[in-house]
């Protein structure tokens, strides 16, 4: 039986005979004495094979990634050979017995190779997961889950599982559909979230629910998205939005303190959605970056520069300035690169003014657009933005969405650039934030109707219920997102608990009574049986762990992730299925070229 994990061998074991299991990380032959670095999930230990011992012959056969059992005596390392990088670095194990549990073919890569392509890593994921960094990532993920459970258990939350095979309902992204063999022509959907089931649990009287569960969305993938992801899903009854936020702010603070010994600020700052968009162009602003928008829409209405004037007078458009302290030193090539960058977000260009000498007014400014801006506009621009000599001011002028997306992304890019770091434009602190009071609806110009900004079960703010029928664009929601360093790590809301209000929301979304009854009849019925006031939140476990570990991709904190093409390179899923299986499911493929 194993005495302890290999990486846990230390001075406390001196003079003891221990049995260890693990993999050969490295083998070294030093003039007749063989050294093995034995590895397991806890770390490394040095194993020494003396040529006078019978185990030496077996040691000569050992190669990297052989799985072995070792029994030996723990002794101090010779003076001058201690390794402070290892927990076991002061000791070594003099092997008495060794057993090869399984040999290994030559691995396709060295585990300490940091330049592997992601394709190679995901194809050989079993070996990739042996790497110490990946083991640390997944162990940290486990610890986060444990601390979440501890915290919620102490507050009386109950872990209740909800179905994985459920009804397809519109929640913004495409569902993964599962055909029913028994009910021909009918399909289950894999849940995008347990949203409706957790609301049913509140109606059922389970007033505090949580679940760490898989969710599924068939959407285009980015670095921070997976088709299947893990959600910390929570719901509670009889609490208002302030009380709900307090519980889960405390939970995140607890997790960071216990897992990483990080003290997050208390309380988290709070900002309305409107303010966040006005100041940062984003509903998940990265507060590590000190740069902010200055809105100059009103200033630019009567200038001769048509790009600014048109945006300043068009409904739904805006003109903003982004002052970058010390940015006048940016080169033309750097500015061109930023111009190309904002083009990704739909911006048609990137106007700028370098403030060489603020005291000289127009004469101290450098830009092709200065001649098209009158003195009053320039003076107000400098006053509002607080521009000083040596600064640069970038501009966004277009439809509000394009300006917010483009200049908001530029703000973050400059802040975290080498220039931004040298200029002190971004901190390395943890910067949490609550963003509250979101619009209930977004208008889809293509379809000519409103869609739910979060989901259609979010309660309107007090006094906004009448807007559901008179003017949905004015309705704001009791919705809230927890943002950390520019990532939305959790989102939630107070839910609608009255059937008549839920029906009004469906009508605002152009979901007719018949469609609402067909898709959500069970919800509408449940709300009529004394449904309590309730609300909740869901956190992205994958995102939280990605941030804690500093991983470059969310795929580095998931054991067996999918690629950006939603494929598992290890198992080659998704795969074809044979005709018999399709017939049993009453499915026929049409116009599909199998690759």
From Swiss-Prot:
Tree of life domain: Bacteria
Subcellular location: Cytoplasm
SUPFAM superfamilies found in the cross-reference section: Class II aaRS and biotin synthetases, GAD domain-like, Nucleic acid-binding proteins
Binding site for ATP: 217-219, 226, 488, 540-543
One of the record's GO molecular function terms: aspartate-tRNA(Asn) ligase activity
The UniProt record lists the keyword Cytoplasm: yes
Residue ranges of the region described as Aspartate: 195-198
GO cellular component terms listed in the entry, alphabetical order: cytoplasm
Transmembrane portions of the chain: none
Documented EC number(s): 6.1.1.23
Pfam families: GAD, tRNA-synt_2, tRNA_anti-codon
Broad class of where this protein is predominantly found: cytoplasm
Keywords: Aminoacyl-tRNA synthetase, ATP-binding, Cytoplasm, Ligase, Nucleotide-binding, Protein biosynthesis
Site (Important for tRNA non-discrimination): 30, 80
Enzymatic class: ligase
UniProt GO BP: aspartyl-tRNA aminoacylation
Residue sites binding L-aspartate per the record: 171, 217, 454, 495
Catalytic activity: tRNA(Asx) + L-aspartate + ATP = L-aspartyl-tRNA(Asx) + AMP + diphosphate
NCBIfam families: aspS_bact, PRK00476.1
PANTHER family: ASPARTATE--TRNA LIGASE, MITOCHONDRIAL, ASPARTYL/LYSYL-TRNA SYNTHETASE
Physiological role: Aspartyl-tRNA synthetase with relaxed tRNA specificity since it is able to aspartylate not only its cognate tRNA(Asp) but also tRNA(Asn). Reaction proceeds in two steps: L-aspartate is first activated by ATP to form Asp-AMP and then transferred to the acceptor end of tRNA(Asp/Asn).
Oligomer status and interactors: Homodimer.
Family: Belongs to the class-II aminoacyl-tRNA synthetase family. Type 1 subfamily.
Name of the molecule in the record: Aspartate--tRNA(Asp/Asn) ligase
Annotated organism of origin: Bordetella petrii (strain ATCC BAA-461 / DSM 12804 / CCUG 43448)
